[in-house]
Swiss-Prot record:
It holds the Pfam family 3A. It is found in: Host cell junction, Host plasmodesma. Belongs to the cucumovirus movement protein family. One of its GO terms (cellular component) is host cell plasmodesma. The lineage of its organism: Viruses, Riboviria, Orthornavirae, Kitrinoviricota, Alsuviricetes. This is Movement protein. GO terms for biological process: transport of virus in host, cell to cell. Transports viral genome to neighboring plant cells directly through plasmosdesmata, without any budding. The movement protein allows efficient cell to cell propagation, by bypassing the host cell wall barrier. Acts by forming a tubular structure at the host plasmodesmata, enlarging it enough to allow free passage of virion capsids. The keyword Transport applies. Its main location: host cell.
Amino acid sequence: MAFQGTSRTLTQQSSAATSDDLQKILFSPEAIKKMATECDLGRHHWMRADNAISVRPLVPEVTHGRIASFFKSGYDVGELCSKGYMSVPQVLCAVTRTVSTDAEGSLRIYLADLGDKELSPIDGQCVSLHNHDLPALVSFQPTYDCPMETVGNRKRCFAVVIERHGYIGYTGTTASVCSNWQARFSSKNNNYTHIAAGKTLVLPFNRLAEQTKPSAVARLLKSQLNNIESSQYLLTNVKINQNARSESEDLNVESPPAAIGRFSASRSEAFRPQVVNGL
C-alpha cells in the first residue's frame, strides 16, 4: 500500500504484511533475548570497579540493523516517507546501593546519542547520585526522535550511560541499576518539550514495619532495655507471630509477666522521603 501522508502510526503507513514483518523483527525470541543480554532491559546492572563506565544501547545492534533495513526498503520503493526513527518517551532507572552508607562514592547517569562521538548528555539531562542518597529513581526524556542510521561503524540510537566515581577500596559491586523503557519506531518524527532529568529520592524499605503486633523478640528486648527483671520464660502452646525478617515464623513463647508491662506500638510516624525534582 502506498504511503498516503496522513497517517501517524507505522501500522497505518504500511500494509498489514509489512507491519507483521516489523513485529517479527521486534518480538522474535532472538530479539527479546538480545534486549536482555545486550541492553539490560528490566535487568539489574551491577556497577563494579572493573566496569566503572557502562554504555548500554536501547536497541540491540542486530535488531537495529534489521529495523533500519525494513524502513529503507519501504522508503526506496516509495511506501514510507523516511528511513525510520526511534522514539523513546521516557527512560526510568531504579538505583540502589549495595554497600554501607559510609562508602564515599557516587554515580553519574545520563542519556546519550551513540551518533555523538563524545557521548555527551542529551540536552544536559544528567543526574549525579551520592552513595548516601540511594535508593533513588531517575528519569530521562529525549527531546527528539533518533534516526535509524549508521554513523561510521556505530548504529545510531539512544543509550544509557552510567559512570562510577570514588568508592576507594571497593572493588566489587557498589550499586545496582535497573533500567526500563519502551522504544517505538516510526517513519515520522517530532521534537518534544525540554524537561530536566528527574531525580526522586526514595525512602529505604522498612521491613520491620510490616509487623501487625509486637513480636516475642521485640518484647524481650524492651524488657531488657527498661532494666526490668523478668522471670524465666517457659515454652507453652501460645503461638506468637515472629516476623523479624521477611519470612514469618511461628514461635511458641509464653507471654511476659504483667510486671513487665505492655509493649507500646505507638511511634512517631516515619518521615516521608524528600522528593527533589520529582518524576
